[in-house]
């Protein structure tokens, strides 16, 4: 079994003090920021979206752990701006085109779970 990694969930992060929170995470050695991306279609909730992800990337170099709870992720992945250091989780039941989503992610070398 591999080495454990720390991935801090951003779902309940204080948006007003986000910059300070990110600084604490960086100082404490958090290795990933976990982002629950929800579209209100695959799951009934809405979660953190593309603009939030872009904002986080502007604040830190910490890679993202993207949990995609979205319908048909293979058509939406390009909006997210995935990087080689990110981890991406998709639900197999969120699409009829799982292989297309995997093929789209392959060039990024992302960890896929």
Segments (PLM) and residue ranges:
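Conserved N-terminal beta1-alpha1 strand-loop-helix module at the mouth
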Residues: 1-87, 93-97, 104-110
């Amino acid at each position: 079994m591999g080495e454990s990694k720390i991935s801090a969930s951003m779902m309940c992060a204080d948006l007003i003090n986000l910059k300070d929170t990110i600084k604490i995470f960086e100082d404490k050695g958090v290795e990933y920021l976990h982002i629950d991306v929800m579209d209100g279609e695959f799951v009934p909730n809405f979660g953190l979206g593309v603009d939030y992800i872009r904002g986080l990337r502007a604040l830190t170099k910490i890679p993202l752990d993207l949990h995609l709870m979205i319908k048909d992720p293979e058509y939406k992945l390009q909006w997210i701006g995935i990087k080689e250091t990110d981890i991406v989780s998709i639900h197999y039941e969120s699409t009829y085109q799982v292989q297309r989503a995997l093929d789209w992610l392959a060039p990024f070398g992302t960890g896929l779970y």
